[in-house]
Structures are given as structure tokens and as C-alpha cells.
Design a protein with these regions (language model features):
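Conserved N-terminal beta-strand and adjoining loop/helix that marks the start
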Residues: 2-28, 49
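Positively charged, low-complexity intrinsically disordered regions
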Residues: 4, 62, 108-110
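Active-site-adjacent beta-strand/loop module that shapes the phosphate/pyrophosphate-binding cleft
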Residues: 12-14, 22, 74-75, 81-112, ...
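Conserved Nudix-box catalytic region and its N-terminal flanking loop in Nudix hydrolases
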Residues: 25-70
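Nudix hydrolase/Nudix homology domain
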Residues: 35-41, 106-150
Length: 150
């Protein structure tokens, strides 16, 4: 099913985040874009979108292509949920999942697969947005795992 919502033009910022999922787990890697001295584990693919009236599915595919050197999959990002950022007021986040059939289909430096429980039990290790999204991403990861193992 295509997600054809247009990105809102009245928000300060719109961010598209893509969560690679496989075997019921979420792929994360260290990101230091907020604090260089204390990198937090977060989703590896995220972009700020400043365009007005842009299709979020199209933008998510562009973001995935930007990271093609880390991916070995033809899968497309799938819309999951729209929510507001925990850390930046006025920021809307469009969260996508990238379903992978094998954990070998993705490689970022220092990246790894974790469960939503890992994220919940170790809040200081993960970004605030990922902590907010972890339960939903855990359910999405399990759903895609069930789908691929039918």
C-alpha cells in the first residue's frame, strides 16, 4: 500500500527515518550528529526534508538510494508511522521500515541488530527518538519476520 500523504508545510522541520529490520530485530549504529563526545546508537538512515508538498514515499526511496553502498537489497522502505520528535519541538518524523530477508544485506561501520527490549533496558545507549520508536519498531520487525518466514 502506497503512503501518499504530503509532507506538511507548516512544520519547522520534517525528518524521514528508515529502520532496517530483520529476524525480529532493528539495525542501529553509532551516530554522533547531536553530541560528538557521546555518540548514541540510532537508526542509520535519516534525512531532514525541507521541501513543501513532497511525497514521503518518494523521499524515503531517495534516502535509501543515498546509502546504497551499505545495502544489498532491492526492498523498498515501508511507511510505519508519523510522530513528533522527542527532542526537537515542532519536528515531524515519518518513520519507515526497510524489511531485510538476511542480516547480511546491510553493513554500516559498527552497526548491529538489537531487539526493542535491548533499547528499553539501556536508554542511555540509544537516541531519544529511537527510545520512543522502539516498541513500535519491535512489533514491525516481528511482523516482517513472520511475513518472510511463512
Amino acid at each position: 500500500m502506497k503512503h501518499s500523504n504530503l509532507l506538511p508545510e507548516n512544520n519547522k522541520m520534517t525528518i524521514i527515518r528508515i529502520a532496517p529490520v530483520c529476524n525480529g530485530k532493528i539495525y542501529v549504529n553509532p551516530r554522533s550528529d547531536t553530541d560528538k563526545n557521546n555518540p548514541r546508537m540510532d537508526l542509520p538512515m535519516e534525512e531532514c526534508v525541507r521541501h513543501v508538498s513532497v511525497n514521503s514515499d518518494k523521499e524515503a526511496r531517495k534516502i535509501k538510494e543515498k546509502y546504497h553502498q551499505h545495502l544489498q537489497t532491492d526492498a523498498s522502505p515501508r511507511f510505519c508511522v508519523k510522530h513528533h520528535s522527542s527532542k526537537e519541538k515542532g519536528t515531524t518524523i515519518y518513520l519507515y521500515v526497510l524489511p531485510l530477508k538476511s542480516e547480511d544485506e546491510i553493513r554500516f561501520r559498527e552497526g548491529k541488530f538489537v531487539t526493542s527490549e535491548d533499547i528499553s533496558k539501556n536508554p542511555g545507549v540509544y537516541s531519544l527518538d529511537l527510545q520512543t520508536e522502539s516498541e513500535l519498531l519491535g512489533m514491525a520487525a516481528e511482523l516482517w519476520d513472520d511475513f518472510y518466514n511463512l
